[in-house]
């Protein structure tokens, strides 16, 4: 009998018995959040940095309920939709910045450092990116860039990779289990905004190169492991991806328009087709992503991600 699979994990009869035992103890675990946390803990469903995958587990339990496998307690409140990002003078249009890349001096590209910079990042993206601000789930790092004169130039972020990309997955050559066990080692550049008053040739490719050089160590400092591959999607109706090509990213073709998180090939919400770009962060990235998984890797504590990342290789 095929084990049911939810959110990248197969649930064995023993796993389902654990879920049933937690659900039966309503006095100890009265809410959906408490149930999800306890199931996640008992099944050792962990993120690569050792934290519980509470949200992933909760989503899996909701999917099981929709499929008639279990009944959860009613939600205590309805989730609120995020409101518009409040704007301030900090994100107002600034004087035009022109000239050559050299005129900018050394560029500082670094992760946002505090709540104020995070709020500024959100404002800039909401106000000046053509897609606006979108909430990203899972692991992510946001960056801001300044020139040597303290002028703000750009914003970008990196987040969890797309669930499936046919061209990428063919190139890597991994199977479904390997993809589920190693997908965290692929990171998506999900936002790249050069502020519209900044008109400097070769700035975009320069920033991409700087991001590639520092992201592995920044990501490892935040999440205890370093990615081995970057990906990004560029709207093919708006852009050709010239800056990515100039920065050494490889174009794998176009997406089908399904959306980056369409796990079931439903095509219910068509999206614009995009160029698929990748940038290896390790020369052996394909071997690392195809590395054998320990038996029932989803049930056991995951392997030490440092052993799978280029920061640990000599």
Residue positions per predicted region:
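Acyl-donor binding region in acyl/amide transferases
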Residues: 13-19, 26, 30, 41-60, ...
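Basic, amphipathic alpha-helix used for nucleic-acid engagement in HTH/winged-helix/SANT-Myb modules
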Residues: 1-16
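Conserved N-terminal entry element of GNAT/NAT acetyltransferase domains
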Residues: 2-4, 20, 74, 81-114
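Short, cationic low-complexity segments
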Residues: 294-314
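Short, basic alpha-helical nucleic acid-contact segments in DNA-binding proteins
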Residues: 56-73
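Extended, charge-enriched "interface" segments that sit outside catalytic cores
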Residues: 35
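Short, charged low-complexity linker/loop segments at the C-terminal edge of domains
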Residues: 68, 72, 281-294
């Amino acid at each position: 009998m095929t084990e049911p699979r939810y959110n990248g994990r197969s649930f064995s009869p023993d796993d389902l018995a654990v879920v049933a035992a937690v659900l039966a103890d309503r006095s100890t675990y009265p809410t959906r959040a408490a149930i999800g946390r306890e199931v996640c803990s008992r099944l050792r469903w962990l993120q690569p940095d050792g934290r519980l995958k509470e949200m992933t587990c909760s989503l899996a339990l909701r999917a099981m309920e929709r499929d008639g496998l279990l009944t959860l307690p009613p939600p205590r409140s309805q989730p609120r939709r995020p409101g518009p990002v409040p704007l301030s003078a900090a994100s107002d249009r600034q004087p035009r910045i022109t000239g050559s890349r050299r005129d900018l001096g050394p560029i500082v590209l670094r992760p946002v450092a505090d709540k104020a910079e995070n709020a500024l990042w959100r404002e800039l993206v909401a106000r000046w990116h053509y897609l606006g601000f979108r909430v990203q789930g899972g692991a992510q790092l946001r960056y801001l860039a300044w020139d040597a004169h303290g002028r703000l130039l750009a914003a970008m972020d990196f987040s969890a990779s797309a669930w499936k990309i046919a061209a990428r997955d063919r190139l890597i050559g991994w199977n479904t289990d390997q993809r589920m066990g190693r997908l965290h080692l692929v990171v998506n550049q999900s936002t790249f905004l050069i502020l519209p008053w900044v008109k400097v040739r070769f700035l975009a490719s320069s920033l991409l190169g700087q991001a590639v050089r520092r992201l592995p160590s920044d990501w490892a400092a935040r999440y205890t492991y370093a990615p081995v591959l970057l990906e990004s999607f560029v709207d093919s109706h708006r852009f050709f991806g010239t800056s990515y090509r100039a920065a050494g990213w490889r174009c794998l073709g176009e997406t089908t328009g399904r959306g980056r998180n369409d796990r079931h090939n439903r095509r219910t919400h068509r999206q614009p087709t995009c160029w698929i770009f990748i940038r290896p962060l390790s020369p052996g990235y394909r071997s690392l992503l195809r590395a054998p998984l320990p038996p029932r890797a989803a049930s056991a504590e995951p392997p030490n991600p440092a052993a799978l990342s280029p920061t640990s290789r000599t």
